[in-house]
């Protein structure tokens, strides 16, 4: 068999696998939005069956045979060619999948599905005791998976693993290691705590009560759809639905869905949650469609993905220019804003206050929420903490980092679905996304000029086009660190993000 024939076989086989995985994505969307209460048990079995089938395909020995034919051939001589990128990523995925026993893959998929379903019901009733056995099982299976992956060599060119947690982190942010993360977080923590102290000591406080007036859900939904359309989200290739825990999910190139969570007496959750998930969806809608089903057409990492969502939620969506454009319309849609000025509204949506809930945190304190989770995850996978001890450790770290502590489980250790879904190693990518976002935005302004005046005129396409050309179009061609360096000329750093916050909040809290 020629290298060309082997590569064609790989393309066809991997695309077929991607079609099956996209059915799993559709089932996952349904499970978190529309499924009847009595359908969860059957759905867990469906997901387990699909996981078994996908694992069998991902470990098919023919993949190894085809890869061997292609590797070292002229097809992959240029390491940045489409074929070379695909072969590089397929090889790593194949080795990782082959190392994980089918029994473990199936058990983990079923345990995660069951834990997520139970979490949906248990969180509102604050049932930590009932949820704990589900979490313990997911944690034990995830740790077993991490031990298997830790024994593998990292991808060519990536640094070696230093600890068990690295093997999980690598699955979400390829090439990132805990030893690189921790100095970034240390620099960030110092800068954030200094800024937070100055803000809290300024004596200035916005009137956030204006955000807790009546905001009818249907009006929020209509307004959210208007924002989506104006910013460039293709509503003919996606949809917006309500859910308990907002997310974006890509079913395929013409089907990228987002969800949000509405409260009748809180403006921010529904509107800024929509903008956040829209940022994720704009990335997915901007990936090269001709490469769908291959790594060349995939998002490079969760950190880069998060950079897009945080950009649209915060750097765009919480800017004064954005609301100069949309606040007049908001006053038409929401009678509650009739007596509110643009300046007071903008100050309110940028209020800074230590809080308990990560997804509702402000830009200054958000990454301290992530630091809590990172430290707890590291402790879990270093054997320094067990799942039973999480509530107490959680409260202690919240007191230390944010000066607040939860009075219950639902607003404490049970507030996120991530651990139920086995997503250990995922949380740090949120902070990496904030750092990348600030670096990308800084570079965009250097090339396009000031962006807020454009936003005030409703001109979002030039910035979206810039991100499409420099970030989205590259797919997984480059490692995240390399992509950031190529786009901005600098390695990932906390400095641009801290500079952005200092400038913005000095103007607000002066």
Curated annotation (Swiss-Prot):
Motif (I/NRXXA/SD) spans which residues? 357-362
Q: Pfam families this protein is in? A: Peptidase_M32
Q: What class of enzyme is it?
A: hydrolase
Q: Enumerate the transmembrane spans.
A: none
Cofactor: record remark: Binds 1 zinc ion per subunit.
Q: Which domain of life is it from?
A: Bacteria
Chain location of the short sequence motif GXXQDXHW per the record: 412-419
NADP as a keyword of this entry, yes or no, is: no
State the UniProt keywords alphabetically: Carboxypeptidase, Hydrolase, Metal-binding, Metalloprotease, Protease, Zinc
Motif HPF per record, residues:
245-247
**Catalytic activity, as annotated:** Release of a C-terminal amino acid with broad specificity, except for -Pro
Instruction: Kindly indicate whether the keyword Hydrolase belongs to this entry.
Output: yes
- The sequence motif named HEXXH is recorded at 276-280
What GO biological process, any one, is recorded here?
proteolysis
- The residues annotated as the active site are 277
Return the motif ranges for HES/GQ: 305-308
Kindly give the PROSITE patterns that the UniProt entry links to this protein: PEPTIDASE_M32, ZINC_PROTEASE
Per the Swiss-Prot or TrEMBL annotation, the motif DXRXT is positioned at 255-259
Q: What does this protein do?
A: Broad specificity carboxypetidase that releases amino acids sequentially from the C-terminus, including neutral, aromatic, polar and basic residues, but not Pro. Has lower activity with substrates ending with Gly or Glu.
Can you tell me which family this protein belongs to? Belongs to the peptidase M32 family.
What name does UniProt use for this protein? Thermostable carboxypeptidase 1
Q: Which organism is it from?
A: Thermus thermophilus (strain ATCC 27634 / DSM 579 / HB8)
Highest classification ranks of the organism: Bacteria, Thermotogati, Deinococcota, Deinococci, Thermales
């Amino acid at each position: 068999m020629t290298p060309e024939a082997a590569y064609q076989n790989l393309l066809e086989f991997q695309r077929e696998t991607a079609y099956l995985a996209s059915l799993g994505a559709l089932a996952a969307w349904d499970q978190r939005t529309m499924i009847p209460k009595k359908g969860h048990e059957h759905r867990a079995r469906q997901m387990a069956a699909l996981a078994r089938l996908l694992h069998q395909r991902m470990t098919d020995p023919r993949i190894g045979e085809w890869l061997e034919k292609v590797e070292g051939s002229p097809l992959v001589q240029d390491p940045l060619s489409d074929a070379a990128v695909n072969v590089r990523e397929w090889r790593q995925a194949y080795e990782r999948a082959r190392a994980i026993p089918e029994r473990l893959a199936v058990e983990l998929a079923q345990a995660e599905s069951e834990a997520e379903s139970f979490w949906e019901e248990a969180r509102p009733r604050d049932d930590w005791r009932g949820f704990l056995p589900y979490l313990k099982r997911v944690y034990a299976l995830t740790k077993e998976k991490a031990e298997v992956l830790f024994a593998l060599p990292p991808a060519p060119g990536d640094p070696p693993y230093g600890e068990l947690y690295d093997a999980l982190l690598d699955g979400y942010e390829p090439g990132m290691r805990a030893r690189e993360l921790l100095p970034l977080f240390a620099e960030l923590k110092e800068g954030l705590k200094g800024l937070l102290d100055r803000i809290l000591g300024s004596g200035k406080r916005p009137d956030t009560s204006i955000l807790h007036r009546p905001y009818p859900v249907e009006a929020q939904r209509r307004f959210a759809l208007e924002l989506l359309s104006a910013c460039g989200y293709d509503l003919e290739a996606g949809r917006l639905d309500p859910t308990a825990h907002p997310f974006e999910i890509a079913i395929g190139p013409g089907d990228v869905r987002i969800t949000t969570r509405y409260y009748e007496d809180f403006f921010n959750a529904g509107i800024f949650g929509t903008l956040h998930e829209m940022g994720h969806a704009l990335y997915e809608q901007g990936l090269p469609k001709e490469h769908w089903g291959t790594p060349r057409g995939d998002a490079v990492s969760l950190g880069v993905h998060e950079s897009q969502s945080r950009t649209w939620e915060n750097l765009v969506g919480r800017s004064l220019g954005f609301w100069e454009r949309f606040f007049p319309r908001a006053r038409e849609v929401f009678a509650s804003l009739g007596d509110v000025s643009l300046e007071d509204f903008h100050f309110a949506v940028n209020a800074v206050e230590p809080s308990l809930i990560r997804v509702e945190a402000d830009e200054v304190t958000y990454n301290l929420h992530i630091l809590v989770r990172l430290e707890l995850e590291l402790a879990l996978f270093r054997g320094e903490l067990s799942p039973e001890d999480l509530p107490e450790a959680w409260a202690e770290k919240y007191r230390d980092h944010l000066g607040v502590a939860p009075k219950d489980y639902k607003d404490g250790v049970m507030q996120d679905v991530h651990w139920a879904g086995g997503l250990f190693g995922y949380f740090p990518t949120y902070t990496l996304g904030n750092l990348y976002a600030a670096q990308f935005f800084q570079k965009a302004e250097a090339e396009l000029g000031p962006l807020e005046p454009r936003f005030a005129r409703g001109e979002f396409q030039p910035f979206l086009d810039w991100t499409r050309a420099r970030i989205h179009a590259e797919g997984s061609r480059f490692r995240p660190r390399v992509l950031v360096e190529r786009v901005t000329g600098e390695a990932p750093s906390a400095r641009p993000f801290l500079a952005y916050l200092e400038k913005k909040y000095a103007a607000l809290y002066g």
